[in-house]
Amino acid sequence: NWMNNDFMKIENNQILSQALYSFDLSIFSLYPSLTTGGTLISLSRDETTNFKLLFERLNKTVINTWISTPSFVDICLLDPSFTEKEHPQLVQFILCGEELTKKTAEKLLTAFPSANIYNTYGPTEATGAISSVKITKELLTENDRVPIGFAKPGVDLKIMDKEIIIVGDSVAKGYFENPEKTEQAFFTVDGKPAYHTGDAGSISADGMLRYQGRIDFQVKFNGFRIELQDIEAN
């Protein structure tokens, strides 16, 4: 219930749904809107691929909670009217699916200085986000790279050989009909399910998780995973 407890306390919440429903980020908007009586604001494929249509739709739509990938909000920041002055009801941003760059975080904080902006982190294999942190000027000043937050309830984060390991009940059992890949990625720690994220990272004394890049050849584009070796091979 942490999603509802942390982010869904806005009455009559109008929640943006940017992600495709085949993308795990979509559950951030879909299920909280259903369980809290909010309204789901869906964008058409044309609106997400045509900037003119996108900006027109946003300028005539009331949104309270914005849920998207960082790259999508970066696109929207190209519109001069995407500001707190023009969108006073937009009071919360929840970003996930790829790294939030410091540049994008600074631009968003400048455009919406009163909004609550959260950077979240978590792979599909751990049922979505497993950590989050509120973006502030102080946080950005103190860090060269935007941190990815503190662990959510039921999640234990570890660093093993510089890799972020997720431990807890949110970790999946494995990949469907792919035992070889399952064996490579999933294991147990003290009898609890654990997952190799493939992300390099560190955890500070106060529990803050920081992302330090990939330890393999995988990159993310608009939230989707791309294996560079597959591109080279094909």
Which residues fall in each region the model found?
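Conserved AMP-binding/adenylation subdomain of ANL enzymes
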Residues: 1-14, 24-64
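Short, well-ordered beta-strand segments
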Residues: 14-16, 22, 28, 41, ...
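Conserved AMP-binding
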Residues: 19-23, 46-47, 71, 124
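Alpha-helix capping/helix-boundary segments
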Residues: 71-73, 100, 171
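AMP-dependent adenylate-forming
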Residues: 116-119, 134-234
